[in-house]
């Protein structure tokens, strides 16, 4: 038994730039031999994904549009995937969003539209995507999403995103229960804070990083490569007995007293 992902078709959703956790995951999966299917939303991200995919040493990636707030576009995306590869063996769901003004101050100030937007993109999108992909996961497989400690504990300024991540965490468990009989595993990685494009929207993010460097058992922050290698493990047969799990990759910060 090894970490090889050769012969596996894995969908990677959420790559924005070279600092994205999704890109760290994509590189680890590529190095393990997987064929990658990238999705993007919008022309700006299309260009970025094409440029990054072009840096990989195998030219076998597929790149498709997929707006996860649009069920018809999700269906179109996965119909195209089915036509091109037939079978999907994994999905890396690395998608989250909340309005910047919701990520500062008190959670109580969250408005209805902001609440629904954060949950639609950050939580429900996983269910919508899995629903579309399920008919193509005929050989079993693995689904991995990204969560954060702010879904378990109150983290300053994380606010509505923390509530959305708590919803995502519960979704992982229910999806794992639904899909286990088909040998499809569903897990999440709770990554430590990483300086990504989406992290820029969180107020006082630098203080969060400093706190981790001072208090986490490993005395350092997390890298996209560490998260990527953990994802590769969860996609591999080495993790075949794991489902419904939330695996923390945060230098141990989650065990520290607040």
Curated annotation (Swiss-Prot):
Substrates-to-products reaction catalysed: a 2,3-saturated acyl-[ACP] + NAD(+) = a (2E)-enoyl-[ACP] + NADH + H(+); (2E)-butenoyl-[ACP] + NADH + H(+) = butanoyl-[ACP] + NAD(+)
Induction: By cold shock.
UniProt cross-references to InterPro entries, sorted A to Z: Enoyl-ACP_Rdtase_NADH (IPR014358), NAD(P)-bd_dom_sf (IPR036291), SDR_fam (IPR002347)
Functional pathway: Lipid metabolism; fatty acid biosynthesis
Keywords: Fatty acid biosynthesis, Fatty acid metabolism, Lipid biosynthesis, Lipid metabolism, NAD, NADP, Oxidoreductase, Stress response
Positions that bind substrate: 98
Residues at the catalytic site: 148 (proton acceptor), 158 (proton acceptor)
UniProt binding sites for NAD(+): 14, 20-21, 67-68, 95, 165, 194-198
Pfam families named in the record: adh_short_C2
EC number, UniProt record: 1.3.1.9
CDD domains to which the protein is assigned, alphabetical: ENR_SDR (cd05372)
UniProt site (Involved in acyl-ACP binding): 206
Enzyme class: oxidoreductase
GO biological process: cellular response to cold; fatty acid elongation
Residue ranges that the Swiss-Prot or TrEMBL entry lists as coiled coil: none
Inhibition and activation profile: Inhibited by triclosan and acrylamide.
GO terms, molecular function: enoyl-[acyl-carrier-protein] reductase (NADH) activity
Subunit composition and interactions: Homotetramer.
Functional description taken from the UniProt entry: Catalyzes the reduction of a carbon-carbon double bond in an enoyl moiety that is covalently linked to an acyl carrier protein (ACP). Involved in the elongation cycle of fatty acid which are used in the lipid metabolism.
Similarity comment: Belongs to the short-chain dehydrogenases/reductases (SDR) family. FabI subfamily.
Protein name, UniProt field: Enoyl-[acyl-carrier-protein] reductase [NADH] FabI
